[in-house]
């Protein structure tokens, strides 16, 4: 390919390159060692190693062409090639098209300029063609073949992209290729005969970060299952890192965090994920977050342009971003100017006749925006006019909007149980903010605080006259300055709606709230019970929430939201936040503000595991380490900051600050998002730094911070003294220094305003991996603690078994959209019920781990074991059930193992298994396995009732049934007390299958012959005992019974079939477990076989290394 001309010193180059062809102006060279017999000897080997380590282009392109001029030692590299054919093509083109022209130039300088210009033109032409494709299909196809050949992953594994880089093995960099696929990060290197192959699943990564050290200038650090991996020498390290970050977060959300995993068309199907799709999604998410747009919006186009700012009389340079329903602009010249134009507000789009390629967008309210220097502005104007027509048609047609798709009716949590609504449960929606109702402004008696409030209002009115008012107002640095000073009481609700983007949600969903209120009131479920419990705990000191008006409004908003979003339902702290929203916003506005906070501004905060809040706590700790290192040196345990700051994040400081100060924090939050909360948290710690450094323990530090919060005041607050929380305290504690909230917020902006949104987003992504993996580790430790009490395995063996169990669940879900394991995964369930496997997954694990997996009927054994363990017949088993079977196989006594085998051959475990494909022998297809695993054994009615009660009390996700828990616990205790006398008898067909299984288990055993003889003796002994028993119980029929003849000890299995009675007499034949046990104990060979110690540790190690391989083979 053609290269951008760069200087090369030929004197040094000749040591590593050999000349192939040359003429007056060009030289064709070949890299030493390439294309030579024996690889060019030692020199070729060293050059090849150097290329690999330094990631030289020569490693993949060992040919190049240089442009030379006479009497000069400086040459220009202009082309390179992967093979002789490619470079010869370039050489021929130069001779045919360039050489003839060069003779007309007089000076060497003109020749060089001409060649450089020609080559740059060729590169630009190639760039235009390849940009449309983004990736070279030929190269990608070649990389895909290498990926499949090197790692042998299933063909469904989708390669997203690949990069050349170095992997550090100790202190040695190994040059190779990094492949990023949907489920794995893979690296391959082959250097000097040494092969390195690394496969890391995204779901196993707990840390992913860019690092810099003395040796590694820039590298990507990956931590997986306690092992650290470093990759460096990337051509585009930022692009690589962002893509890795997206893939890791996608896997984590999909597999661990189904609760918050949104269906996304870009990520819905793991087989359709592409590099371009991921980049598009990342830009779209960033766009929505920056402009606070509804989550349904997607970024369609981006255009560089200038926007005329009328009040400043200059054009601001920035980017115009267009989505389905919005035109947005953000400056890039440091003016902090941004504009959001909803298409529903647009009246006309015109283009000017001047040469500036300008577009004028006129909106309602007699405002116009002028965008200039737009490329392809003719096409852009046509597209925008089309969008505006579509938007206006939509507005005309739909005046009523149904419940949106993400809240289709009540969830399974909502049982439609009519309630006798109390008096306060009125459906009348408040049309005024509670502050307006309970604290109307007295315009006649204006005190100093009210005068300041009026001055604030005047400042905002001046801003509105300059920048406009409403959704499409200009947002500038002046806007932020006014927000920091505190929004006036009368404008607070309006501006919260504006800055949060809730105004757009409400405008596009008219009538939605009233409909949801109507549908949700009168329902009863766990969420509504929790809401009722917390209603009177929400700002109890405020008069608005001491009356039915405020309480009813709060109930309606919270219940409506729980109905809209059953994934979240209701979470503690939502009541405190909503009560403050209701003070300043109308009821419907408060609902949409809550939607904006829970679903966009604080994602994943208000779910069962408050993952979002935990992630932001980790981000806060990271910022403390960066900005307040002396505090982290003093406070060795960083968990203190986590415990203290949780309420700060969940309630936006409302729970720790007096209400009159907290609302100023909420002002900043709606304008700046989580950045404002993090900055304020740092400012508070910085303000109290000296006190915190003298604290000896956590309790002392908490007391110091609480005392500080008690003395935060808002001296300009116009709220009456009976409402202000700070005023009462300030009288009692006058000896402590008062801190004004406005000064504190200003200080937080001055000191920590340099923290960027992009950095916070990156820290959130990075810490999300760590937080979720920590939660998963907690789940694992709790499961192991419970299970370890019932098994003989060591904790280490149990730990490894759990990892394999969970890994198999994930591997089987990697390439499928609907996996039963993921479908039933619910982090809110008890730890043991969170991860469960189906019969197909159990079969794979049985083949990997069972000491009986060598048996010819291993699929049948796996099926019967699964049916035995699946006591509640939901076709899923948890880790406790799984580990109990493995423990018996490896650590059980002779009696335990025999009892397990006996149970496998009687109902409910046993079922007749016939494979449809006789050629496969006993092997069962996935469909057959699924069919047989779901077969139900008929049981008495009373037993069915008992079985149905064995399901987890929380599986319905409704109210937790304590009685069901006690019943389940009692069942487990009874199960432990089960004796061998409680086991039912085994009939003829079951006994034949039991005998066959024993024969299969003994196959290829060192004592195979003696085991066969022993089982033949036992079988015949049992038959004779049963014959005698029959004669004793049925003397009349004894004459018709054939006399026993001793079987030959050669073929015992044929003797079993010969001596057993005909099927019509089957009901008369059966064996008790005690009979079988007593007979087997008489044969030492059988006892030795079942009591032989088995190496579980080695089996686990082998399973871990071959788990993925076994999946690809099956």
Curated annotation (Swiss-Prot):
CDD domains: PH-GRAM1_TBC1D8B (cd13350), PH-GRAM2_TBC1D8B (cd13352). Pfam families: GRAM, RabGAP-TBC. GO terms for molecular function: calcium ion binding; GTPase activator activity. It is found in: Cytoplasm, Cytosol. SUPFAM superfamilies: EF-hand, Ypt/Rab-GAP domain of gyp1p. Residues 940-957 have a biased composition (Basic and acidic residues). The arginine and glutamine fingers are critical for the GTPase-activating mechanism, they pull out Rab's 'switch 2' glutamine and insert in Rab's active site. Involved in vesicular recycling, probably as a RAB11B GTPase-activating protein. It comes from the Eukaryota. GO terms for biological process: glomerular filtration; vesicle-mediated transport. Keywords: Cytoplasm, GTPase activation, Repeat. The record marks 533 as: Arginine finger. This is TBC1 domain family member 8B. SMART domains: GRAM, TBC. The gene is Tbc1d8b. It comes from Mus musculus. InterPro entries: EF-hand-dom_pair, EF_hand_dom, GRAM, PH-like_dom_sf, Rab-GAP-TBC_dom, Rab-GAP_TBC_sf, TBC1D8B_PH-GRAM1, TBC1D8B_PH-GRAM2. Residues 486-673 form the Rab-GAP TBC domain. Residues 399-420, 938-957, 1032-1061 are annotated as: Disordered. The keyword Transmembrane does not apply. Residues 399-411 have a biased composition (Polar residues).
């Amino acid at each position: 390919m053609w290269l951008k001309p760069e200087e090369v010193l030929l004197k040094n180059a000749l040591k590593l390159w050999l000349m192939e062809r040359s003429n007056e102006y060009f030289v064709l060279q070949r890299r030493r060692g390439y294309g030579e017999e024996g690889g060019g000897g030692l020199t070729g080997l060293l050059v090849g190693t150097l290329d690999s380590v330094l990631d030289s282009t020569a490693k993949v392109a060992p040919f190049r062409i240089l442009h030379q001029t006479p009497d000069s030692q400086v040459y220009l590299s202009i082309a390179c090639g992967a093979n002789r054919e490619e470079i010869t093509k370039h050489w021929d083109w130069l001779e045919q098209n360039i050489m003839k022209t060069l003779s007309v130039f007089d000076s060497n300088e003109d020749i060089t300029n001409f060649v450089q210009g020609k080559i740059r033109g060729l590169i630009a032409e190639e760039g235009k063609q390849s940009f449309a494709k983004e990736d070279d299909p030929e190269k990608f196809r070649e990389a895909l073949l290498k990926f499949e050949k090197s790692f042998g992953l299933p063909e469904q594994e989708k390669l997203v992209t690949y990069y050349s880089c170095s992997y550090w093995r100790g202190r040695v960099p190994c040059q190779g290729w990094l492949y990023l696929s949907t489920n794995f990060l893979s690296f391959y290197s082959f250097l000097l005969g040494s092969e390195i192959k690394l496969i890391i699943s995204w779901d196993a990564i707990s840390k992913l970060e860019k690092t810099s050290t003395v040796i590694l200038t820039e590298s990507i650090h990956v931590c997986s299952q306690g092992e650290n991996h470093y990759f460096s020498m990337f051509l585009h390290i930022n692009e690589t890192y962002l893509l890795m970050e997206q893939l890791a977060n996608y896997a984590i959300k999909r597999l661990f965090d189904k609760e918050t995993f949104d269906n996304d068309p870009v990520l819905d199907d793991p087989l359709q994920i592409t590099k371009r799709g991921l980049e598009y999604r990342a830009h779209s998410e960033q766009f929505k977050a920056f402009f606070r747009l509804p989550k349904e919006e997607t970024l369609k186009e981006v255009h560089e342009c200038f926007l005329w700012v009328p009040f400043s009389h200059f054009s601001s340079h920035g980017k115009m971003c267009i989505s389905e329903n919005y035109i947005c602009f953000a400056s890039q010249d440091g003016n902090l100017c941004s504009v959001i134009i909803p298409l529903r507000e647009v009246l006309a789009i015109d283009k000017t006749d001047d040469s500036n390629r300008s577009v004028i967008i006129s909106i309602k309210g007699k405002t116009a925006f002028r965008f200039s220097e737009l490329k392809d502005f003719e096409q852009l104007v046509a597209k925008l006019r089309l969008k505006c027509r579509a938007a206006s048609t939509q507005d005309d047609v739909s005046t009523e909007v149904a419940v949106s798709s993400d809240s289709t009716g009540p969830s399974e949590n909502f049982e439609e149980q009519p309630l006798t609504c109390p008096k306060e449960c009125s459906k009348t929606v408040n049309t005024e903010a509670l502050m307006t109702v309970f604290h109307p402004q007295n315009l006649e008696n204006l005190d100093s605080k009210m005068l300041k409030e009026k001055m604030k209002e005047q400042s905002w009115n001046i801003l509105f006259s300059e920048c406009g008012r409403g959704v499409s107002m200009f947002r500038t640095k002046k806007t932020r300055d006014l927000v920091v000073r505190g929004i006036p009481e009368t404008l607070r609700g309006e501006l919260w709606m504006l800055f949060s983007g809730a105004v757009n949600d409400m405008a596009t969903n008219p009538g939605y709230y009233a409909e949801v209120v109507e549908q949700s009131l009168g329902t009863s479920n766990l969420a509504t019970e929790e809401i009722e419990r917390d209603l009177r705990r929400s700002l109890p000191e405020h008069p608005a929430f001491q009356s039915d008006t405020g309480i009813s409004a709060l109930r309606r908003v919270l219940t409506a939201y729980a109905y809209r979003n059953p994934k979240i339902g209701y979470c503690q702290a939502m009541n405190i936040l909503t009560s403050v929203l209701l003070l300043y916003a109308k009821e419907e506005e408060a609902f949409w503000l809550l939607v904006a906070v829970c679903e966009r501004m604080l994602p994943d905060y208000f779910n069962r595991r408050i993952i979002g809040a935990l992630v932001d706590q980790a981000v806060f700790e990271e910022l403390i380490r960066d900005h307040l290192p002396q505090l982290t040196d003093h406070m060795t345990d960083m968990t203190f900051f986590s415990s203290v700051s949780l309420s700060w994040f969940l309630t936006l400081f409302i729970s720790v600050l007096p209400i009159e100060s907290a609302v100023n924090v909420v002002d900043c939050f709606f304008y700046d998002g989580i950045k404002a909360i993090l900055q304020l948290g740092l400012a508070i710690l910085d303000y109290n730094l000296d006190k915190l450094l003298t604290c000896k323990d956590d309790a002392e530090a908490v007391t110091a911070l609480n005392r500080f919060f008690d003395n935060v005041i808002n001296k300009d607050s116009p709220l009456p003294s009976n409402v202000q929380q700070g005023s009462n305290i300030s009288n009692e504690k006058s000896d402590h220094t008062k801190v004004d909230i406005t000064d504190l917020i200003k200080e937080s902006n001055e000191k920590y305003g340099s923290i960027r949104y992009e950095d916070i987003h990156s820290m959130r992504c990075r810490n999300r991996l760590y937080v979720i993996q920590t939660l998963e580790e907690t789940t694992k430790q709790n499961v192991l603690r419970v299970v370890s009490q019932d098994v003989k395995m060591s904790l280490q063996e149990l730990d490894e078994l759990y990892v394999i169990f969970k890994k198999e669940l994930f591997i089987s879900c990697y390439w499928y959209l609907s996996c039963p394991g993921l479908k039933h995964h619910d982090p809110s369930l008890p730890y043991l019920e969170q991860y469960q496997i189906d019969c197909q997954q159990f079969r794979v694990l049985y083949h990997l781990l069972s000491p009986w997996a060598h048996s010819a009927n291993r699929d049948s054994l796996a099926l019967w074991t699964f049916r035995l363990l699946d006591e509640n017949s939901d076709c899923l088993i948890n880790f406790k059930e799984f580990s109990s079977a493995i423990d018996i196989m490896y650590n059980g006594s002779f009696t335990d193992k025999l009892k397990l085998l006996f149970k496998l051959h009687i109902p409910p475990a046993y079922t007749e298994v016939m494979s449809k494909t006789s050629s496969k022998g006993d092997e069962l297809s996935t469909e057959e396995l699924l069919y047989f695993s779901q077969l139900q054994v008929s049981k008495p009615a009373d037993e069915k009732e008992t079985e149905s009660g064995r399901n987890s009390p929380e599986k319905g996700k409704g109210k937790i049934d304590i009685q069901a828990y006690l019943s389940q616990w009692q069942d487990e205790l009874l199960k432990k007390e089960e004796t061998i006398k409680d086991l039912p008898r085994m009939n003829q067909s079951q006994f034949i299958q039991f005998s066959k299984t024993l024969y299969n288990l003994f196959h290829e055993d060192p004592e195979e012959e003696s085991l066969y003889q022993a089982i033949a003796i036992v079988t015949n002994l049992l038959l004779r005992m049963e014959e005698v028993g029959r004669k004793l119980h049925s003397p009349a029929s004894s004459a018709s019974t054939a006399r026993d003849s001793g079987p030959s000890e050669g073929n015992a299995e044929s003797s079993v079939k010969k001596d057993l009675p005909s099927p019509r007499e089957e009901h008369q034949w059966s064996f008790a477990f005690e009979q079988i046990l007593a007979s087997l104990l008489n044969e030492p060979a059988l006892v030795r076989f079942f009591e032989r110690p088995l190496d579980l540790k080695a089996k686990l190690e082998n399973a871990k290394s071959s788990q993925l391989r076994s999946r690809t083979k099956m």
